[in-house]
Amino acid sequence: MSAKMKSKSILMLHMALLAALCGVLYFAYLGSTPFFDKGEPREALAVQDIVQRGEWLVPLKKTTDIPSKPPLFHWSAAISSLITGQLSESAIRFPSAVYATLGVLFLYVLGRKLFGANVALLGGAILATTTIYQNQALSARVDMTLCFFVTVSLGLFYSLYRGFLTREIWYYVFFSLVGISVLAKGPLGIVLPALVVGAFVVLKKRWDLVSKFCLHPGVVVMLILGAGWYVIAVTRGGEGFFDRQIIEENLSRFAGGSGHSHPPYYYIPYLFALGLPWSLFLPFLLWDSFKKGFLSDDDSLFLKLWFLAMFVFFSVSMGKRPVYILPIYPALSLLMAIWFYQHGAAAGTRRVLYRLMAALAGAAGLMLIVVTLGALWSHDPGWFFSPVERLLKAKDRANLLVVKNALATFGWSFTVVALLSGLLWLSLARSLWVGRLRSAAWRLVLIAVAVAFITRAVVMPVIAEAKSYREFMSKVDQQVTAHSKLLLYGSFNSDPVIFYRGGPIETLDQPLEELASRIGSGDLFIIMPEQLFVEIQKQRRDLPPPLLKSAGTGPEGDARLVLVRGGEL
């Protein structure tokens, strides 16, 4: 076999392996949980508006509310829903999983060109298994869409800089992708690539790149794609749209005038927490990167600036949420892969630290082996909850019982996964003990797959069902036909209720005292928080019980809902 054919075969094999890894981590769990937080149903309502009303240009929430983000994700989710023929959680989450998978594959292609196939394969696997990346790949939010287009934009810029891409058309592709990035999450689509490229140009003193890119005709294409939709949307949405998407979501968010304000050091703990399991090695990576020399080579420098420029920008911005730093992880993943291939056995303090990590990994492995043996002996996968159960309060014991019952539904499959995980942790401990870092890295990838099964198939569904209104709304639909009048009353997050109902629901706005006299009988149906119903019961002792009561407590965990009858208002 010729070298060219062998290289192509390796390329196809590695791409297939990474695609399979993403399939196991992402696509297998798209429908494993209902919507239960604030973010997903909020975006789902815009998708619902596109599918039901055909409002592609400026989709609205509840047919009246202007969404907080541009519609690129919503367009993608609407197309997914139309193709599958269902407006479901899995269909709406599908674009995030696709963008995440494409991002992993693109990072592999870029890393392969810069550092070789083996480093690129590990870099792609690291990105795919990083906690924040996995979470957003399974979330019906706009952040993975932005991350993908920013990643590809920066990768194309560097490929043009290095001369990997020489045809003029690639400049237009680059500018087009930057323009499209704006439709993912606003001006950040331009700001983030510009920060990285600008920092790179300054440090390399390549002033010729300024005129080469800033004066290129592709800039016009970028502006048309990025600003064109905003211009049209402002003419449709008027001052309300401008205030919502430009002032509140961008300028005020950066300056700290729209909530989520935090100090500059806010992201430091999240950098480690969201980067697990790979952030365990982040201190070593950062130390070695600066010790070796920040400007050591162009390829590593570009990745370092990708990470640092974005991290500093998000830290300086007053408005902060953990998910904002998602776009730094593609660069960090490649840097981590390079580090694993450049470092092996260590001496002195570092050997002690590696062996301390090995001891912790070994302890985790032994614990899982004990869990497995106990399950085989007692025929109860959740036997290990029993000693803890006696120490908890009644409410916590009830929650623990739910998790225990969920484990029982998986039977032997959970036991097998626990056993394999235990063996992998022990194997990881051995690799760390002897300083075989590359071997340890691949064991971490396999451990991440096992952890994904436990969290996505067992733990998260239990958490989701405790908060979601899906089951409640399914019962509401059985009692309240499409021809009956359904109303909402009270202050609670109604986005998931409206989504699962399948369309807008009118909201009542009147004092509780006026409503109380009309509750209990009539042709109307009203959904309200349980605590408000209790307040009405205090005024009317003869009030019949609600028709339905939700098991889910809502995104904030404090809004159990009831369905009641009401008279004409």
PLM feature spans:
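Membrane-integral, polyisoprenol-dependent glycosyltransferases
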Residues: S2-V352, V370-L373, S378, I498, ...
